[in-house]
Amino acid sequence: MRTVEDRSLEFLIRRDREAELPPLASLCCNYFKQRHWRDAFDDEQASLREELWAVKTQLDTIPMEAYTATRNKLFPLALSGEQQQFSNRAGHKLLESMESTGVWMELSKLLCGKSRKRPRDFAFADVCGGPGAFSQALFKAGRKQGWRHLHGYGMTLAGVSGLDWYNSLLNSPQFTCTYGLDGTGDIFKLSNIDCLVSITKAAPMFLVVADGGFSVDFSVANYQETISSRIMYGQWLAALKLLRKGGCCVLKLFDTFSPLSRAVVYLSCFLYSRVHVAKPRHSRVVNSERYLVCVDFLGYPNEAWGRYLDCFYELGFVDNEHVPELMPREWCLQDEIFMADMRDMNMTVATNQMTALQMILNAASAVEEELKAKETTTRTSAESDDSPLSSRESCKDG
């Protein structure tokens, strides 16, 4: 039987260099086709997606405790709460994604210029970043790289348990946090993104990282990609508005089957010199998480792009239940080079994920029996400890 393990994967996503610039200015900003998140997929790689969903659904029969124990036994690298260097695994995932795609090399080249003795000042933005594992990792890595003049800016939801910035960041003169124009830190509001842009206007913003997302109910876990469409697009747009030319961005994605995800990656190929999708080794092979890594920001091709992408965000997402159409799906599908790379990436990640999930399905019953036996032993031991003292023990106490 085929097996897999947690290891870093990297995919270069290219476009046809002869392809015409997508004419976003020709699209209407007053009306966007809407689909409910349940219906926001198309027939592109539908059989692969449905096969993956079918394997995921089989997990419903496994108790959560048994699933977690089996997963951790088979894939120990990605244990929750790993804190060897950072406060959680997210920091590892960011640095591994940057390493596998050459972001460190690109930033070093950009910052050092002609002189390696005095690196240029460098700022990064951590969007939807609370409690701050990405920022924590970047400061640690920055010290290792010798970037002494590193400054971070962060925006996250205010007043949400678990998303408050780490005290080490709040107390650092190298970190500035904001909660946007209205004080909520809500990235769904374009005005809050623009507030962060205004605050960082004079900063040498060469890196934007975004790890935003939210838990979805187990019953709709297969739709996490489309349910997360709004926050995914908002973070991607924030990077475009924040970055200086030459900068890089790292954005968390889930599955990349939907037309919106595909369009975002395709447009990125016109906005950056190089586009990758990375699956870092600390990102569990059993899940769909991956990272869009864009290198060497070129700027908007024209002002019309900026206006349309803003308009789409502000008017297209009427609520959290529907996903608007960013552009005609044919614009992506007709680019054979781009589609070949996307299909290969989706096939590889999904196939590995299905193999990992099947490994869990095959091993879960034995692990569940081990857990039951352990529970029985623990209960028996506890009952023994609570029993009255034997006559011999009574004499000894006397």
Curated annotation (Swiss-Prot):
Its EC number is 2.1.1.57. The active site is at K252. GO terms for biological process: 7-methylguanosine mRNA capping; methylation; mRNA modification; mRNA processing. Residues 85-298 form the RrmJ-type SAM-dependent 2'-O-MTase domain. Residues 371-398 are annotated as: Disordered. Keywords: Methyltransferase, mRNA capping, mRNA processing, S-adenosyl-L-methionine, Transferase. GO terms for molecular function: mRNA (nucleoside-2'-O-)-methyltransferase activity. Transmembrane segments: none annotated. The keyword Transferase applies. It catalyses: a 5'-end (N(7)-methyl 5'-triphosphoguanosine)-ribonucleoside in mRNA + S-adenosyl-L-methionine = a 5'-end (N(7)-methyl 5'-triphosphoguanosine)-(2'-O-methyl-ribonucleoside) in mRNA + S-adenosyl-L-homocysteine + H(+). The keyword S-adenosyl-L-methionine applies. InterPro entries: mRNA_Cap_2O-Ribose_MeTrfase, RNA_MeTrfase_FtsJ_dom, RrmJ-type_MeTrfase, SAM-dependent_MTases_sf. S-adenosyl-L-methionine binds at G132, D211. GO terms for cellular component: cytoplasm; nucleus. S-adenosyl-L-methionine-dependent methyltransferase that mediates RNA cap1 2'-O-ribose methylation to the 5'-cap structure of RNAs. Methylates the ribose of the first nucleotide of a m(7)GpppG-capped mRNA to produce m(7)GpppNmp (cap1). PANTHER family: CAP-SPECIFIC MRNA (NUCLEOSIDE-2'-O-)-METHYLTRANSFERASE 1 (PTHR16121:SF0), CAP-SPECIFIC MRNA (NUCLEOSIDE-2'-O-)-METHYLTRANSFERASE 1-RELATED (PTHR16121). This is Cap-specific mRNA (nucleoside-2'-O-)-methyltransferase 1.
